[in-house]
Regions:
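Catalytic domains that recognize anionic headgroups
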Residues: 1-494
């Protein structure tokens, strides 16, 4: 709850306080509220005073009740202090079947008289699912795409995108019911040591980041189409990153993952800017407000800003201390950690950029985009191919099955490789999971699954012997019988 106020105020309190206007009386909102029209969308904070900003009504109860209740528990785990968090039901990153215990912070006397706890309890009841996240951003995109008003405008949108659950494709459609595809984390939020599990999680994360990127692109396009781009300051940043180093905490920075968690993107566009530059200095979120003030050529003498403008040549600190769990860690000024992360990601996905590259992890991904009948299976001791009809894909429903599970029952040798083809073209590579032996999870290239009816083919290889029985999560079964491979009773050829 410290990061967003730091962005909007340029200061960090020594102790955590509620991210509300009363605790941050000096902010971009109070600075610009008298001169600008305020278009503000705050997902989890209330930093803009109500006399300056209209507060959106919380999502209606028509949203699926169980999902809202689940989000209450998740948010309490994120926001409540340890003494209350210990009493909550255990969660990892899932969204199901723990809502009955959500009353710990919503009822009774928990938080009574404490502004921070009262704010946390109130916000816990107002969080919706990912569709509401998109609505927040899209409402700002729509407003910014209109011709400029005579009165200058200040847009501020804080969304929890691209937080888990990771379930949205770049076009915004759901690609999985998230409750059925939990992330491979232990009870403390640490990744499994199985790299394949983490690579699959990264695939899902990347797709959802693509959705956010598309919405930001829509904002830029809207500003340009409305003739406003050259007169607008645009700042895009995040409050934290996510570790994908196997065996580390997903959210808490450690020596092995410090750069992943604490190095976040910061993009600044200034009015009239005609070329881009890259600045490798260590910047902080508290530098955003001074930078905006510098662009607008405004200053307030009695403000005690802790950050610096990134545009006036001020020498920035060479090292930055960050709070990581219960300890303080130092982020070094070099880019070695970030470059190492980029090299690891490139090794995980070596077959090109774009969404096809994300669907093609590891050496086995080299065949994504090729026809099944052209595959060279080498000396594989076992191979099986089956066709399964996919129900009509219709993205207007808000869903496209880009995540497919293939389970291999342990009645024979496990396949070494699983590839899934759509209409006889390899569209994704299956990665074996650690906690569920025989389960392979596949992300499909969205370009190879357009709207319409399709046939899906599962191609399994084994270098060590005859294959066992395969099961598609959708319900179709691939089974070896004396008559050959069968799907739902239909005999196939090998």
């Amino acid at each position: 709850s410290d990061s967003v106020p730091a962005i909007a105020s340029g200061v960090v309190h020594e102790e955590t306080v509620a991210p509300i206007a009363a605790e941050y009386p000096q902010s971009l909102f109070t600075l610009l509220g008298g001169s600008h029209e305020m278009i503000v969308r705050e997902d989890l904070t209330q930093l803009c005073p109500t006399d300056l900003c209209e507060v959106d009504q919380p999502p209606t109860r028509s949203v699926v009740q169980s999902l809202v209740d689940d989000s209450v528990v998740v948010l309490q785990h994120l926001l409540l202090p340890p003494r209350l968090r210990e009493e909550l039901p255990a969660i990892d990153q899932g969204w199901g079947d723990f809502d009955q215990a959500a009353s710990i912070a919503l009822g009774g006397s928990a938080g009574a008289g404490d502004p921070l706890l009262e704010w946390q309890n109130q916000q816990a009841t107002e969080v919706s699912r990912t569709a509401e996240r998109s609505r927040l951003i899209e409402s700002v995109v729509d407003a910014a795409s209109e011709p400029a008003d005579p009165q200058p405008e200040f847009y501020f949108v804080h969304s929890v995108w691209p937080h888990a659950p990771w379930e949205r494709a770049p076009d915004g459609t759901l690609f999985t019911p998230s409750a059925d595809h939990d992330l491979p984390l232990d009870e403390t939020g640490r990744w499994t040591s199985n790299e394949a599990d983490v690579v699959h999680a990264y695939q899902r994360h990347a797709l959802q980041v693509g959705h956010v990127d598309r919405m930001i692109g829509d904002l830029v396009s809207g500003l340009k189409d409305a003739g406003r781009w050259d007169d607008t300051v645009v700042v895009v940043t995040a409050d934290h990153g996510t570790s994908f180093t196997p065996g580390t905490s997903r959210r808490v920075g450690e020596d092995a993952s410090l750069d992943e968690v604490y190095r976040v993107p910061l993009f600044v566009h200034t009015p009239g800017q005609d070329s881009a530059t890259i600045d490798d200095r260590l910047t902080r979120l508290i530098d955003v407000t001074p930078t905006v003030m510098d662009v607008l050529d405004v200053s307030v003498d009695d403000w005690d800003l802790e950050g610096y403008s990134l545009l006036d040549g001020t020498e920035l600190p060479e090292r930055v201390e960050v709070r990581s769990g219960n300890k303080t860690m130092t982020v070094a000024p070099t880019n070695e950690g970030a470059l190492a992360t980029a090299a690891r990601n490139a090794a995980w996905f070596p077959h090109g950029d774009g969404w096809r590259g994300i669907a093609a992890p590891g050496p086995a991904g080299a065949l994504v985009g090729r026809r099944v009948d052209s595959l060279d299976v080498g000396d594989a001791a076992g191979i099986a191919t089956t066709d399964v009809d996919i129900a009509l894909v219709d993205r207007s429903t808000g869903y496209a099955p880009l995540l497919v599970d293939i389970a291999v029952e342990p009645t024979g040798t496990m396949p070494d490789r699983i590839r899934v083809a759509v209409d006889e073209v390899v569209a994704g590579v299956g990665l074996p999971t650690q906690d569920e032996p025989g389960l392979f999870r596949v992300i499909l290239d969205p370009a190879l699954l357009p709207d319409g009816a399709h046939t899906m083919q599962v191609v399994a290889w084994s270098d060590g012997g005859a294959l066992g029985e395969l099961t598609l999560q959708a319900g179709s079964r691939l089974q070896r019988t004396p008559d050959g491979w069968q799907v739902a009773g239909r005999v196939l050829t090998e």
